[in-house]
Design a protein with these regions (language model features):
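Short, flexible helix-loop junctions that flank or precede catalytic/ligand sites
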Residues: 1-174
Length: 174
């Protein structure tokens, strides 16, 4: 197992990919705010003539992307962690390879139940639903406030069933 701190430059990212290709479980950190932006950051650090090759390479070695954000709790004591989870299933790997990173968010939404993926909005919604964070905090952190507001509105819809929390939260509750 190899842990690479901040992957900021081409040389470091190139080394991480090379190490992962040799079969070593490789962890790296980047300061990004979504799974898609993480993948774009890795690819974009390379010159344009190499990016197709890097997309193919990354699609083969990527094992997961976890983005996290610590948010102030509603009760004012401590922080709650919102997280985005990307699990590279065959569809995700294909989107990376075909340079369709912009479609990953939709694939993550669809892969919540089956693959354990989760968008930040799904995580924010679960934290808000459990009253761990305020609506203001949830909306401030959301990159798609309309989507999050729709999720929240469905929760309060008369006669409507409350949506189930994202898979990681549902499992932790058991």
């Amino acid at each position: 197992m190899v842990l690479i701190g901040e992957m900021r430059d081409l040389e470091t990212i190139e080394a991480a990919l090379r190490i992962a290709e040799t079969g070593h479980l490789t962890f790296g950190t980047l300061h990004t705010n979504s799974a898609s932006s993480t993948i774009n950051r890795i690819i974009d650090v390379f010159p344009s003539h190499q990016q197709s090759q890097i997309r193919a390479q990354l699609s083969l070695v990527l094992e997961g992307v976890l983005c996290q954000s610590l948010l102030p709790k509603a009760d004012g004591r401590g922080r709650a962690m919102a997280m985005e989870i990307l699990v590279p299933n065959p569809a995700i790997r294909n989107l990376i390879r075909e340079d369709k990173i912009h479609q990953i968010y939709s694939a993550m939404q669809a892969g919540q139940e089956k693959f354990g993926m989760q968008t930040f909005n799904q995580s924010l919604f679960a934290l808000y639903q459990k009253k761990l964070i305020t609506l203001e905090v949830a909306l401030a952190r959301s990159s798609n406030q309309d989507e999050l507001q729709d999720m929240i509105n469905r929760l309060g819809a008369p006669g409507g069933a409350a949506p189930r929390p994202p898979a990681p939260y549902a499992q932790a509750k058991k």
